[in-house]
């Protein structure tokens, strides 16, 4: 995801489809004063533009941190099939746990699509 100076909210995300990076970005919430510009939503937006479609079926989203519900929903609407993240929400300095439902539970409850959610800690990655 390239080099970037550390900032308090330094989140990154990469979208991969057919073994090719089609979108990547960082969190822009504070610099743009826009609460929707999380790394995941920004990377999905770039991936859709680069891929030429709003449908990213078969893509994987890799994130530095566990996606929030907004980002999970955006991934679902974009057709992303797999989400992999390194740092769980409960491990973050700036926790944003808005619900007691895990992403894995939420993914299992979806009736209109299947999304695999994997936590691969940094020590393992």
Where are these regions (language model features)?
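Conserved Nudix-box catalytic region and its N-terminal flanking loop in Nudix hydrolases
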Residues: 31-34
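Short beta-strand scaffold segments in enzyme catalytic cores
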Residues: 10-19
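Short beta->alpha transition motifs characteristic of CBS
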Residues: 22-29, 88
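Residue-level recognition of the N-termini of beta-strands and the immediately preceding loop/turn
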Residues: 9-11, 57-59, 115
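Zinc-dependent deaminase
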Residues: 1-6, 67, 73-125
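Short HxH-centered metal-ligating active-site micro-motif
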Residues: 36, 41-70
């Amino acid at each position: 995801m390239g080099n970037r100076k550390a900032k308090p909210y330094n989140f990154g995300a990469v979208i991969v489809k057919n073994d090719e990076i089609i979108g990547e970005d960082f969190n822009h919430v504070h610099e743009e004063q826009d609460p929707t510009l999380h790394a995941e939503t920004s990377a999905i937006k770039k991936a859709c533009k680069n891929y030429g479609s709003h449908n990213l079926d078969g893509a994987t989203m890799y994130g530095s941190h566990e996606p929030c519900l907004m980002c999970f929903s955006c991934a679902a609407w974009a057709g992303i099939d797999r989400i992999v993240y390194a740092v769980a929400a409960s491990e973050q300095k700036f926790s944003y746990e808005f619900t007691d439902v895990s992403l894995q539970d939420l993914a299992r409850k979806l009736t209109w699509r299947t999304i695999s959610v994997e936590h691969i800690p940094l020590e393992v990655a």
